[in-house]
Structures are given as C-alpha cells and as structure tokens.
Amino acid sequence: MTDHALLLVNLGSPASTSVADVRSYLNQFLMDPYVIDLPWPVRRLLVSLILIKRPAQSAHAYASIWWDEGSPLVVLSRRLQQQMTAQWTQGPVELAMRYGEPSIESVLTRLAGQGISKVTLAPLYPQFADSTVTTVIEEARRVVRDKQLDLQFSILQPFYDQPEYLDALVASARPHLQQDYDHLLFSFHGLPERHLNKLNPGHSLEGSGDCCANASPEVRTTCYRGQCFSVARDFAARMGLPDDKWSVAFQSRLGRAKWIEPYTEARLEALAQQGVKKLLVMCPAFVADCIETLEEIGDRGLEQFREAGGEELVLVPCLNDDPQWAVALNTLCERAPVSL
C-alpha cells in the first residue's frame, strides 16, 4: 500500500431519525454559506425559523426510507467505498460526509496521522455547484489550514460529460428502460437561480430547454442547469430515445426564492394530464439513493403523479455500488488534476 489515499465525499445524513439528530444535521447543512448564500445574521435567522417545524417533518420522511443498516445514503456510499478498494491500488479508500459523520476533518486528520501524503479528493457530484463541489473543496482547505496538515491534493472534477460516467449510467439504467413505459423524466436537484446568476451574470435561465445550447465553454463549466441538460441529452442519445420520450425537471425547492425550472412537481402533474400512465424517473444529480430520491420521488412523487391521473411511477435506482460505476469512478479519479 502506498501513501496516496482516495477520499470519497458525499452529502451526508442525520445520525438517526430522531428529531434531535435531524435538527442537528439540518442546522449544519443549512448554515453552510454555500447552501444558503445570505449574510450570516440573515442566514442564522432564516435557519432558526426553518428549524421550528422542519426537523419533525424531515424526521418522519427519513423514518419512512431508513434501512436496518442505517441511512440509505451512508450505507450505499459505504458499499461503493468497498467496491473502490478493489479498484484503487495507490493506497487506502476512505469515505467522508460534508455534513454529519464521518466528517472531512476527522478523516483527513486521521490520514495525515497515518503518514498519508497525497489525497485524491472525490466529491461525488456529477455536475458543478458551489453548494456541492465548492463547499467540499473549501472544507478540505479549511481543515488543512487549521490543522496544518502536510497533504497534497488531487481533486476530481465534475464528470457529467465524461464517457465513463455516462456509459455506467446507461448500463445501470438500461434494464429498467427495456420494459414498457410512456415517458422518462430526469429529475435533478434544483438550485436557487441566484446561485447560478452569481457565477454567470446575464446568462439566461428562462424557458424549459437547455440554457447552455449556445453558451460559451466558460459558462458551461459552471452552469449547473446546462450540465443537467447535457447529462439527459447524452443519456437519451446513447439509448436512442426520441425527443418526445423524455424531459428534464428540477426538484427539492426550499423557501420562496425562484429556483431553476421546470419544477418536478409541475412536470409530474403535466405528464399525468397529458395521458402518461407509466412514468420512469431518473435522478442523475445523485450517485447514491437518498431521501430526495426514495422519499421525495419514490413516495411523494408517486402519490402526486397518481392524484393527477397517472398510474405507475418507477424510480430508476442511482448508480449506488454498481461495479461498472466503481470502475468508471476509479478511472476518473486516477486522472484527477493536482490542486488545492
């Protein structure tokens, strides 16, 4: 074993489904300035208001999808970590969560204490967003600075357009698309429009189509919405899907600010009203199934679709611990550029 570790980083999860644990997790998550990008006093006030009712509501949602082994996101991430140990030959493979445990700080501190000198930091997010990729990188920077750790980093870049990722996504989903269905909906996690406007002022996010169809490469590099459409378009091309067989929407809105559109809730209703009876839903913003896929789409989305006139909603599993995904991820991590 060499001194080059691979650190997989996912979002995180409450320690349990108790209201207290969910409140603690939500507080850490929502107080991240990359998640709610408001001045600290305003953010603190807003989060305090959210934490009045949201922990109990979220605890109920977590309880509905919790596994015997624990949080699905954590369990599936652990399984991927195990798969990666057979792929990554340069050193240990570790797992950290941006929020909750195991923390980035605890894992990096332990690795440095074990004599590790190089770390490939792998944020497990196909598309770029400050609230996912940037916050992971900045937290690693903070830990290295505050703990004075002597670590050299390579950083996995967003891989939404990489053939290895797309091929693994197609291979994983193909069995589900070989059954009869009326429509495939790609439901990506949403973001407030202001997050994107800060990165690319003046870039139009209007309409229901790809906002980056005619954008410059510089804009595409940081436009989360355009990268989501890119994934859907490339997937559809690989599967030979006609344009009227698939569409894109964005889920998980929080608060009153305008988020990127079209919204998944509205799209579910519209598809049902258009006569779609059997709907497949993929969530390619996530590489592991979690509360946003299992509960928000698999449970609440199904209920909403049926209430609008649909009959069956099939949630296509995320990549999770698929062996081809592990091979693809290893390839992507091996060519990650040196940074930090």
From Swiss-Prot:
Keywords: Cytoplasm, Heme biosynthesis, Iron, Lyase, Metal-binding, Porphyrin biosynthesis. It is an enzyme of class 4 (lyase). GO terms for biological process: heme biosynthetic process. The keyword Iron applies. It is found in: Cytoplasm. Fe cation binds at residues 189, 292. It catalyses: heme b + 2 H(+) = protoporphyrin IX + Fe(2+). NCBIfam families: hemH (TIGR00109). It comes from Pseudomonas fluorescens biotype C. GO terms for cellular component: cytoplasm. GO terms for molecular function: ferrochelatase activity; metal ion binding. This is Ferrochelatase. Belongs to the ferrochelatase family. The lineage of its organism: Bacteria, Pseudomonadati, Pseudomonadota, Gammaproteobacteria, Pseudomonadales. Pathway: Porphyrin-containing compound metabolism; protoheme biosynthesis; protoheme from protoporphyrin-IX: step 1/1. Its EC number is 4.98.1.1. It holds the Pfam family Ferrochelatase. Catalyzes the ferrous insertion into protoporphyrin IX.
